[in-house]
């Protein structure tokens, strides 16, 4: 699964799953541009990628920011071959208490940004008749979760978007897929107390949380030449928590 000569853009790459994805794609030979919301975050990405890529500051909810970053990538690296839409946020609340902005912020960051970025890189991929778009979803987008109606709706939307876009661009050599993580060992899960952690693990037949590297491995496979005949799919990586 060699990615030599490919340029990969990974959003939300400063930590957790995004960082693991950026690191693994770089290990496989890709030149990786990882994004963060701040200049300091972008510098941290540049530091860990070293000669294998660089970090850039990107506001995924701002069309002008997206345009500027993609122009910079094109000028320096010649365009994007692999897009990994990983950036996302949570604004958890019960639906009865959910504020308008808690809904709209999630939709803008977790769904609309995927539309904007995917559309922005698509023309270049279609001209080359080759490209990979990989969206990071969530098990919640399929099974739902109390207190996350906004997040679940956005992640379910990612799956529908993936399937529709895949149908449109498959004949041009561009694949579009989703990787849907379950409970993964990140800063968010490390903050769980013992009771919460026990309750979480009780839902996972594998009996453990996933490692960010395991999500990265799924992404790296879908980004590879070996996955050229896979498109419109959602690859669930959740330790058996939810089986489709």
From Swiss-Prot:
Similarity section: Belongs to the short-chain dehydrogenases/reductases (SDR) family.
EC number(s) given by UniProt: 1.1.1.100
Highest taxon listed in the record's lineage: Bacteria
Protein species of origin: Vibrio cholerae serotype O1 (strain ATCC 39315 / El Tor Inaba N16961)
Positions bound to substrate: 138
Pathway membership: Lipid metabolism; fatty acid biosynthesis
Pfam families: adh_short_C2
EC class: oxidoreductase
GO terms (BP aspect): fatty acid elongation
CDD domains: BKR_SDR_c (cd05333)
Reactions accelerated catalytically: a (3R)-hydroxyacyl-[ACP] + NADP(+) = a 3-oxoacyl-[ACP] + NADPH + H(+)
Positions contributing to NADP(+) binding: 12-15, 37, 59-60, 86, 151-155, 184
Subunit relationships: Homotetramer.
Active site residues according to the UniProt entry: 151
Keywords on record: Fatty acid biosynthesis, Fatty acid metabolism, Lipid biosynthesis, Lipid metabolism, NADP, Oxidoreductase
InterPro entries cross-referenced by the UniProt entry: 3oxo_ACP_reduc (IPR011284), NAD(P)-bd_dom_sf (IPR036291), Sc_DH/Rdtase_CS (IPR020904), SDR (IPR050259), SDR_fam (IPR002347)
Task of the protein: Catalyzes the NADPH-dependent reduction of beta-ketoacyl-ACP substrates to beta-hydroxyacyl-ACP products, the first reductive step in the elongation cycle of fatty acid biosynthesis.
Gene name of this polypeptide: fabG
SUPFAM superfamilies named in the record: NAD(P)-binding Rossmann-fold domains
Protein name: 3-oxoacyl-[acyl-carrier-protein] reductase FabG
GO molecular function: 3-oxoacyl-[acyl-carrier-protein] reductase (NADPH) activity; NAD binding; NADP binding; oxidoreductase activity, acting on the CH-OH group of donors, NAD or NADP as acceptor
């Amino acid at each position: 699964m060699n990615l030599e000569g490919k340029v990969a853009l990974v959003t939300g790459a400063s930590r957790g799953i995004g960082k693991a994805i950026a690191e693994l794609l770089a290990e496989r030979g890709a030149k990786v541009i990882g994004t963060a919301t701040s200049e300091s975050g972008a510098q941290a990405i540049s530091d860990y990628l070293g000669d294998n890529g660089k970090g850039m500051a990107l506001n995924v909810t701002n069309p002008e920011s997206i345009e500027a970053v993609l122009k910079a990538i094109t000028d320096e690296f010649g365009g994007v071959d692999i897009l990994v839409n990983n950036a996302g946020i949570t604004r958890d609340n019960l639906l009865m208490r959910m504020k308008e902005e808690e809904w709209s912020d999630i939709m803008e960051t977790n769904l609309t940004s995927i539309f904007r970025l995917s559309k922005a890189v698509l023309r270049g991929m279609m001209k080359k008749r080759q490209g990979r778009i990989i969206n990071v979803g969530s098990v919640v987008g399929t099974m739902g979760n109390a207190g996350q109606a906004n997040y679940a709706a956005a992640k379910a939307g990612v799956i529908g978007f993936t399937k529709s876009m895949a149908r449109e661009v498959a004949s041009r050599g561009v694949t579009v897929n989703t990787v849907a993580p379950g409970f993964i060992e990140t800063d968010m899960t490390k903050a769980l107390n013992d009771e919460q952690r026990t309750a979480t693990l009780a839902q996972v037949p594998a009996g453990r949380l996933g490692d960010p590297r395991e999500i990265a491995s799924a992404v790296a496979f879908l980004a590879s030449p070996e996955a050229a005949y896979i498109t419109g799919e959602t690859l669930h990586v959740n330790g058996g928590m939810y089986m489709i």
